[in-house]
Swiss-Prot record:
Pathway: Cofactor biosynthesis; adenosylcobalamin biosynthesis; cob(II)yrinate a,c-diamide from sirohydrochlorin (anaerobic route): step 6/10
PANTHER family: COBALT-PRECORRIN-5B C(1)-METHYLTRANSFERASE
InterPro entries from the UniProt entry: CbiD (IPR002748), CbiD_sf (IPR036074)
Protein name as annotated: Cobalt-precorrin-5B C(1)-methyltransferase
SUPFAM superfamilies in UniProt: CbiD-like
Organism: Burkholderia ambifaria (strain MC40-6)
Class of the enzyme per the UniProt entry, highest EC level: transferase
Amino acid sequence: MRDETPERAAPLRFGYTTGSCATATSLAAARLLVAGHADDAVEIVLPKGQRVMMRLEFCRITADGAEAGTIKDAGDDPDVTHGALVFARVALSAAPGVRFHAGPGVGTVTRAGLTLPVGEPAINPVPRQMMTTHLDALAAEYGYAGGFDVTIGVEGGEALALKTMNPRLGIVGGLSILGTTGIVRPFSCSAYIASIHQGIDVARANGIAHIAACTGNTSEDAMRAHYGLPDMALIEMGDFAGAVLKHLRRAPVSRLSMCGGFGKLSKLAAGHLDLHSRHSSIDLPLLAQWAAEAGANDALQAAMRAANTSQEALKLALADGVPLGDLVCAHALRVARDIVPASVAVEMFAIDRQGRFVGSAR
């Protein structure tokens, strides 16, 4: 078996979510208003009880309240928001409670199916609870009986959001404020997986019965051209086939098409639900075994086992009349059907690097 990219040996550094950044900055701005303290760092408590100190870039009085900002540090995770300035603007109110608003760079929900109602700022439930808990504790500590209006922003967030799935999910105008633990674990890709789930939920809520889960742009284009599906029906799953299949257990659709490059699909066919090379490898001997079951002779099997890439193995098989693409799709289909409810009609498509279909099964 060949792994396509080397694993990173050095320990990876964790970071903090945008939800943690929003909590720290809103607390700092509120404390400046309630207690008169301007901090250069602030301690917050994460959902699992860890206490962390977060550095502030500024904390200052404004014309209508106070504001504070921090630089988002995602550690060694390839996070689109790493290095962005996350800020909070807080105003005191006579009405008790905490009210949230979308500032520059934070999106607004425009479609049903997400965890937030249409019209709400895209500040997810856990960050909202984190901020509310900290602000309630601050009010109790200083005997403040009023409420807080909290506006969260991300500098450059509207442009950064175009690199995320927010536009497709119907979150317009900027990023989402995310996080369930407050911590970004390198390469956990929890935000990406959450966006896959949200994409399925949005499609269901908007009456879409047929979705296509695709590994990338080329497979998306292939599915769009083949079926004429709207963007809302196209789920960009990347390497996370398992995230799609497992979510359909509790949020089923009538029909699922999965489409990806031949190499990626061969990993799913072998039973791997994470298709990234860090977690699964292309098994050329297994491809040769499947080819043998379809009539491949010994010479072809040996050539496939010695191939440099899955694409080379596919080319060898097809040249000898062995429908390896269909075989891989059939095995991938069996893996998927073992996970999703029987009510979901599943089909598989494999494509080459040019986006041409090289195999299918249904």
